Amino acid sequence: MFLKAVNCFNEVKDREFIAKCIRDVIMEVGPSNVVQVVTNNAPVCKAAGLIIEAEFPSIYWTPCVVHTLNLALKNICAAKDTEKNSIVYKECSWITRVADDAMFIKNFVMGHSMRLSIFTSFSPLKLLSVASTRFASTIVMLRRFKLLKTGLQQMVISEQWSSYKDDDVQKAQFVKDTLLDDNWWEKVDYILSFTNPIYDVLRRTDTEAACLHLVYEMWDSMIEDVKKAIYTHEGISNAEISTFHQVVHAILIDRWTKSSTPLHCLAHSLNPRYYSIEWLSEDPNRVPPHQDIELTDEREKCFRRVFPDADERRTVNIEFANFSDGREGFGNLDAIVDRDKMDPKTWWLVHGARAPLLQKVALKLLAQPCSSSCCERNWSTYSFIHSLKRNKMAPHRAEALVFVHSNLRLLSRNTPQYHQEETKMWDVAGDEFGSLDDSGFLEVANLSLDEPGLEAGFINNI
C-alpha cells in the first residue's frame, strides 16, 4: 500500500531528516507491524537505517538487492581507472571498450534520419536508447544488440550504406568493421553469458512480490553460475585459477557482504523447501540451514533482537529445533512431503500451528519484498502528475493524487483484467505517455525488469 508522499522542499536530506520521515511512518502503522525498512545503498540512507535500528531493535534496515546487484554490474562493466582499482580495471576494461563501441554504434545510427531509415529497412526491431538510470543498462543494451545482429550486419554491407556519401566516412567504416568483426561479437556473447546469472537475479528481485526468503539461495547460486560461465569460456578446470573470475568473484562477495543482513538468513532458514530431500539432492554441497554455521550465527542474532525476553527466545528456539529436525508434529508425512510441494507461506499456515511464535515470525518474513522497485513507480507517477506544464499544484494536492492513483493501481492487480489481453500488466512500463515513434528512440528508465515474459513481449512489439 502507498501511504504518503513527503514534501522535502527546502529540507536538507541528511540522515536525521530521512530517519524522521521513516520514524513517523513506523509510528503511524505501529512498530510491531514493521519488519524491515528497504532503501537504496546510499550512505545517507544507510546512516538513517542505523538510526532506526537503534531506536527500534526489532526492525531491520535492508539495502535494496536490485540496487546492490546494479552496483556490482557497474563495478564489473564500467571499472574505473584508479590506483586502488588497478587490478579490476586491468581485468575488466575490455568490457567497457565493448560497451563503448556498442554505444557509439547506437548513437551513430540513431543520430541521423537517413542512417536510421537504412537500419529500419533491415530490422523490424528498433534500437533502444537505454537510460543510464535503468538497472543493468549496459547488459540491456548488449542483449538488444545481440537480437539485432543480423539486421545490423545486413545494413553495413548493403548498397544503401555504401552509396550514402553525405556522412562521416571514417566513423561509418568503424561501425562497419566492428559489426562485421566476429571477435567483437564473441566478446559480446561472453559478457552476456557470465552476466546472465546476475541479470536473472535482477529480474527476479526487481518486483514487489515476496522474495526476501529467496535472496540467500539466489546469491549463492548466482555466484556459482558466474564461475561456471567464466571457467567454461576459458576452458579450464575448477582446480585451476582464473584471474578474471577472481576479480568478478571478489566484487560479488564484497557487495553481498555489505548488503546481507541477519534477516536474509532467518528468512532463508524458515523456508521449508530448503529442508526437503528434493532441494538438498540437487547439489551434493547443499546442507539444510540449521547445519550451516553462518546461517546459524545470523539466525541467533536475529532471534536476540526480535525476542529480547530470554524465556520467549528459548521457546522459539525449541520451536525452530522441532521445525528444522521434523519433530513434534513437523515430522508427519504430509508436512515432510509438502516442504517441496507447497508455497512456503501456505506450508506454515497448514503445518505451523504447533509452533505459534515461530509461525508468526515466518508468516511475516515470507511476505517481505527485497527491493524498493515499488517506490520507483511512485516517482514516475508523481512525475506524470506534477510536470512542467502542470507545475502550480499544491504539494498536498499532488500527494493526494499520487495516493489515489498508486493505490487504485495496486487494487487493479487483484482483478481478472490485469492478467488478460489488452490490459495485461498495464502498469509495468510506468506512467510515461510520451510518443515512441518519431526518431525510434525509446526511453526505458521506468520499464521494470520484473515480469520477464512481459518485458520480451513489450520490447519485441516496438
Set out the residue ranges of the language-model regions.
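Surface-exposed, charged/polar loop-rich segments
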Residues: N33-V35, A48-E159, N238, S242-H245, ...
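Short, motif-level signal for alpha-helix interfacial/capping segments enriched in acidic residues
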Residues: F17-C21, M114-L116, G352-A362
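Mobile genetic element proteins and their domesticated derivatives, centered on retroelements
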Residues: I18, I22, V37-N40, I52, ...
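Active-site beta-loop-alpha junctions of metal-dependent nucleic acid enzymes
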Residues: A5-M27
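C-terminal regulatory segments
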Residues: F9-E11, V35, I76-F104, S162-S163, ...
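Short acidic, Gly/Ser-rich segments with clustered Asp/Glu that frequently serve as metal-coordination loops
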Residues: N41-K46
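C-terminal reverse transcriptase regions that engage the nucleic-acid substrate
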Residues: L127, S132-S137, M141-R144, D189-Y190, ...
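Acidic, metal-ligating active-site segments
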Residues: M1-A5, L266
